[in-house]
Amino acid sequence: MKDDCAPKDDFDLAVIGAGSAGFSAAITAAEGGKRIALIGHGTIGGTCVNVGCVPSKTMIRAAEAVHGAQSAHRFPGLRGEAQVADWAALVAAKDDLVSTLRQKKYADLLPGYDGVTYLDEGPARLVEGGVEIGGRKITAPKVIVATGGRPAVPDIPGILDVPTLDSTSLLELERLPESLILLGGGYIGVELAQMMARMSTRVTIVCRSRLLPRAEPEVSRALAEVLR
């Protein structure tokens, strides 16, 4: 990886977004002998490692451990008990794993690709012939926009007047809440609802039609029965 002090700001490719998609595109192009400007903004690594799959699945697996112990009584002669004794410690362990994987899977890999120049100088703006970032123009005949996404706040009257969480901030809570209302019955809402319920939070799911609306109706009905 070359640093951002390179004398020339002309590249074969500019990639806006240093998440999994942008990272993969930059590395693939570098392996083909191209010069790439990989433009990030904020924390490297994107959604999956920072606020998506890695943190959520870590907490979900912890909830499964609690549920497994509590369900031991289903077998004759077994009894198990488990509860969340230190929520803050659980969140801290999740954050530590995220930090470790972000370093190993992203930051530590870049030095091995001389064709990639990583730039983190603020928001990027598309201009004719390339990208403008940090007050200078990066020229490139091709630009890949891989900026990812973020949780969307639904257009519900009054929602901005009350404290709300999203799939990111839920996993950053300093205290385990006694109760939660989750708006939305998609797969993300359902898996987070089950996770929090297994952690002892009282959870209510509010959805417009049915759980997992893109799945077969039979699946939705079966899931609703299980969650009840």
What are these regions (language model features)?
Residues 11-38, 189-198:
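N-terminal Rossmann-like FAD-binding beta1-loop-alpha1 element of flavoenzymes
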Residues 20, 149, 186:
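Flexible, active-site-proximal loop/turn residues at the rims of small-molecule/cofactor binding pockets
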Residues 7-19, 176-183:
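Beta1/beta-strand and adjacent pyrophosphate-binding region of the FAD-binding site
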Residues 174-215:
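Rossmann-like NAD(P)H-binding beta-loop-alpha module
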Residues 1, 59, 195-199:
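Detector for methionine-enriched segments
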Residues 2-11, 27-34, 39-176, 209-213, ...:
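Glycine-rich flavin
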